[in-house]
Every structure is written in structure tokens, then in C-alpha cells.
Amino acid sequence: DNVLAYDKDEYCGFIFTTNGFLNLFRLMKSVYQKRNYIVHNKDLPIYFIAGENDPVIINKKAWLKSQEFLKSCGYQNITSTLYSHMKHEILNETDKEKVYQDILNFCK
């Protein structure tokens, strides 16, 4: 059902432009530079969630490195959940209720 809805959505499935890639690469470069961070609330709750089979996180080591980067910037209240047997769209996976419950618990 999700795939069908995606295929029918006029805003999905478009061809990413050269400018789109350029801006994405600029964003990725700047997001991992400490000088771009000003921590106003070191206790801000940050919740990292991902599926263990998500190619975007590369691997668990790289995923943990992202969290360590934010800690090195000064954030101290970082928690995370890596969902086994899930891919990129964890909110559309078979066990999505677990993910939603974890997000709800984090927000309480």
C-alpha cells in the first residue's frame, strides 16, 4: 500500500537535480563542523533512531560517531535506539508500533 501511494504521489519519485545534490553536499559538510554549533541548552533531549539495515547510517560505528560528534559539541542528553531488522523507513516497517511507542515515551 505504501509503495502504491508513493508511486501515485506527484511530489515523490522526482529526479533529483544537480543543484539539489550540490545543496545536500554543502549541508552535509557544514553539519559536521563544530564551528557551526552554538549550544544554548546542553541538556536538550536528542533522540537518535534508525533501522540497523538502513544504508543511510552506513553502519553502527558511523551511527554512533554521529552521536559522539554532538556530545563533543556540548550536548549531554543524547539517547538512541537502533531497531534490528528494520531499514530506512522505520515508521513504515511491520513493527512500526514499537517505534511510535518509543518516540512517544521519549516525548513524555
Language-model features: locations:
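Glycine-rich loops and low-complexity Gly/Arg-rich segments
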Residues: 21-22, 30-31, 40, 71-75, ...
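Conserved loop-alpha-helix segment in the C-terminal half of the alpha/beta-hydrolase fold
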Residues: 46-47, 52-79
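Residues at alpha-helix caps and immediate loop-helix transition turns in enzyme cores, especially N-
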Residues: 20, 59-63, 95-99
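Catalytic active-site module of serine/aspartate enzymes centered on a nucleophile-bearing elbow/loop
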Residues: 73-108
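Short, histidine-centered active-site or binding-site loop motifs used for metal coordination
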Residues: 10, 50-52, 84-87
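Alpha/beta-hydrolase
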Residues: 1-38, 42-49
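Short strand->helix junction
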Residues: 13, 55-56, 89-90
